[in-house]
């Protein structure tokens, strides 16, 4: 019988510019910080199993973005759901917690927010862990993305309805978790039930449509992110679910174009790689972070 004590995870809320930002926190506050930024359509819930694995050595913080999880979700008329604005809220969140430097785990929309944060404050970023989050257009699976690209081209009710009829339904949310996994019986239904319950709140589908549409602006931001990679050469660990139906393996490999020393691991799983590969990813992160930001 193991005597290992599992680190305690705290569930807190912080007021940031009038928004109640929910976050999970664990580990010693005087240790190096690891900031976990979640993807669509999830929340910090996606990190529930990873946080205790890192909190023995690291100060781990995982916020819910506005519009997700337990954080405030003001209407699209009352809040700008652009990635630029979400990055600023995340910036203010870290500053209010007096976090002056951090490694970032970036997945899906978390990458779009985190890379903006890195460009804003390169001096604060100690390392990057990228898991199925894109910084190159080639990363998009063209079949999956057709409806999204059509919406970017023409923000019509017809094109919005295509997204509403599948991507933002329980079937679409469930697909995010099950597509490409080795063993669906290992994936808890809690994932898509919780995510869909959040999306089904009044006004939240409008929020998601706004965030999906505003992802179009990432195309113009890629050059800035790639220049940041080339100039700053941040340590990067890439742990990528190679069976993802949203972002391709090419999207993972392209990071090495700007960051030849990036460490790439292709894992036999889908978009939410932590669901099947949390032990592997946690182990890789520990080894990587111990070597790059916690050398003492």
Where are these regions (language model features)?
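Flexible "cap/lid" subdomain of the alpha/beta-hydrolase fold that forms the substrate-access gate
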Residues: 2-21, 26-33, 61, 68-105, ...
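Structural cue for short, hydrophobic secondary-structure segments
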Residues: 36-39, 62
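Active-site helix-initiating loop/hinge in glycosyltransferases
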Residues: 39, 248, 276-277
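Active-site glycine-rich loops that stabilize anionic/oxyanionic intermediates
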Residues: 39-42, 108
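Alpha/beta-hydrolase active-site loop signature
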Residues: 41, 66-69, 135, 270-273
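Serine-hydrolase catalytic-loop signature spanning alpha/beta hydrolases and amidase-signature enzymes
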Residues: 41-49, 60
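Active-site machinery of serine-nucleophile hydrolases
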Residues: 55-64
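Catalytic histidine-centered segment of alpha/beta-hydrolase-like enzymes
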Residues: 270-282
